[in-house]
Design a protein with these regions (language model features):
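Hydrophobic membrane-insertion alpha-helices, especially the h-region
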Residues: 3-15
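Non-catalytic, solvent-exposed segments at the cell envelope interface
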Residues: 15-329
Length: 329
């Protein structure tokens, strides 16, 4: 059953786009020039107690445990990372929420370009305060390990009106070819023509064998000159993931030790503060399937330098109440 969690982690890594140098520099400049009003944010809900919302009284569902999963756009084993330059960005972000009483799992996806408050640091690690910027670059102001994950945990919690987050798990790009080769590759039918001009072998309708050598270009490539190009590749990612799940399930059925070995193969590319007991609980709950999948509401727009996802804060508060709270009167 570890297979389900591993494949969730793989899904997070399928996000892309890497503008570390330009975006972190721009964020630092904005942080240096902001005033105290820019640093305030009023949440409509909280992570504990009761709240009054649109005429009703709600209580946070304290049976929930929420875990942050991140896909990182950098390479190499994480134990080699030392500074901000090594960290990369959290280009795929979602929260897995488990109800310990009902063993139900819900998933909330957070678009990588969501504009929100992040904490900015200079290269020596000194905080420059908060700035409104893409949530995915919050990871870049850490060390690529626990510090980066903790920063993302805080940023995501703040975006979600103080939602408590009990743990995190991230995996970087090098995990994609490793896990693809470990299952022996997968065969896919190219779902669209989004790669055809750049990689003719990926013509729409073509049947292609995906291996560790070509997996990344199939799932991650996008034309960064086109607005909202991160959304275009989603169908390819879905196709890859479905094929990967099927192949991994076949392998797991043939070999009882396959899943444990698969996890060992990607450990060098992951960062987590979640113990085996937490994964075991998630795995048990995952047997019931995912009961709800949501995306932070908003609209993609072209920013001055990069794509932006403008979060609809009112709709987000509605979603937070419906996913994480219970009405008591």
């Amino acid at each position: 059953m570890i297979l389900i969690i591993i494949l969730i982690i793989v899904l997070t890594v399928l996000g892309g786009g890497y503008y570390f140098m330009m975006q972190t520099k721009a964020a630092s400049q904005k942080a240096s020039g902001m005033n105290s009003d820019d640093q305030s944010r009023t949440s409509q809900t909280s992570g504990s107690g009761t709240v009054e919302y649109k005429g009703g009284t709600y209580k946070y569902n304290d049976h929930l445990s929420n875990y942050l999963f991140l896909g990182i756009d950098t390479r190499n084993p994480v134990d080699t990372y030392q500074t901000q330059e090594d960290a990369g960005q959290a280009d795929a972000i979602f929260v897995v929420s488990m109800d310990r009483a009902t063993e139900e799992i819900k998933v909330l996806f957070i678009p990588r370009d969501s504009m929100t408050e992040i904490e900015v640091f200079n290269p020596s690690g000194k905080s420059l305060g908060e700035s409104t910027d893409h949530i995915n670059i919050q990871y870049a102001f850490g060390d690529g390990k626990q510090k980066s994950c903790e920063l993302m945990k805080t940023a995501v919690s703040n975006l979600l009106d103080g939602l408590p987050i009990q743990g995190y798990c991230s995996m970087n790009m090098d995990g994609i070819p490793v896990i693809t080769d470990f299952v022996g590759g997968v065969q896919i039918t190219v779902p669209d023509n989004s790669l055809e001009d750049t990689y003719p072998e990926f013509k729409e309708g073509a049947v292609v064998n995906i291996t560790g050598e070509n997996a990344e270009k199939f799932v991650r490539y996008r034309d960064t000159d086109k607005t909202q190009s991160a959304l275009v590749r989603q169908e390819r990612q879905k196709t890859y993931l479905q094929a990967l799940i099927q192949k991994a399930q076949e392998k797991a059925g043939e070999d009882a030790g396959f899943v444990a070995d698969l996890y060992d193969s990607i450990k060098s590319y992951t960062v987590t503060n979640m113990g085996n007991d937490i994964f075991a609980k998630l795995l048990t709950a995952s047997g019931n399937g995912i009961t709800d999948t949501e995306t932070v509401p908003g609209e993609g727009k072209q920013g001055k330098n990069f794509d932006e996802y403008q979060v609809d804060k009112d709709a987000l508060s509605d979603l937070i109440i419906s996913m994480f709270y219970e009405k008591i009167q």
